Amino acid sequence: MNLPEREPGQVRIGIAIEIPEPYAADLSAARVAAEDPLADSIPPHITLLGPTVLDAKQLADARDHLAAVAAAAPPFTVRLRGTATFRPVSPVVFVALAQGISECEQLEASVRSGILGGELRFNYHPHVTIAHEVPDAALDKAFDAMSDYSAEFDVDRFYQYEHGDDGIWRPQSAFPLG
C-alpha cells in the first residue's frame, strides 16, 4: 500500500464506506485466504478518500467538511457482484459494485474537495479489495473464489478512519448521510 509520510503532529486518515456484517466477514475471509499481508489491518470498505496526511489541528475542519458532504447526500443501496482486477496496472483483485457506483463517485468527488482536495494517483473506481500486492497465483485464486459473490446493503453513513502507529486502520468518526 502506498502510504504518504507522516510527521510528528500529523495524522494519516482515510474516508470510506464500511461494509456491514455478514458481508464484511466474507470479504475479510477472502483477503485472508489470498494471504494478503494487510488482511488484518484494513477492514473491508469502499474507499472515498485514500490515505491522506493532515496536521492534527486541521482535523476539526476536515470533520466539518465531511459532515457537510454527508448531510447533502442521500442514503443509497450498494450491490456487490463478482470480481474484477486492476491488473496489469496494479496487482489488485476486488469485488465489483453493480449498483451504487454513481453515488460513490459523487460522494468521492465531494469528499475530495476543500480541505481534503488533492490529485488522484488513479481514476476513482469504487470497489472492495480482496487481494493486493500478492503473487499472481494468489490474485487468480481470489478472483476465481469470489467470482460468484453477491451482496446488497444500504449505505447511510461513511467513516473517517485513522491509521494507527500499529498499522491498523480504525474508524474514528461516522458521518450520517442525509
Predicted feature descriptions by range:
Residues T77-L80, R87-V92:
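Structural motif corresponding to the early beta-alpha repeats
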Residues D156-D166:
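Short beta-strand segments and strand-loop junctions that repeat across beta-rich extracellular domains
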Residues L97, H163, L177:
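Active-site donor-binding loop signature of nucleotide-sugar glycosyltransferases
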Residues P88-V89, P135, D165:
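Short strand-connecting beta-turns/loops that link adjacent beta-strands
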Residues M1-T77, T85, G100-R157, R170-G178:
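Basic, often amphipathic N-terminal segments
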Residues S90-A98, C104:
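Charge-rich, low-complexity N-terminal segments
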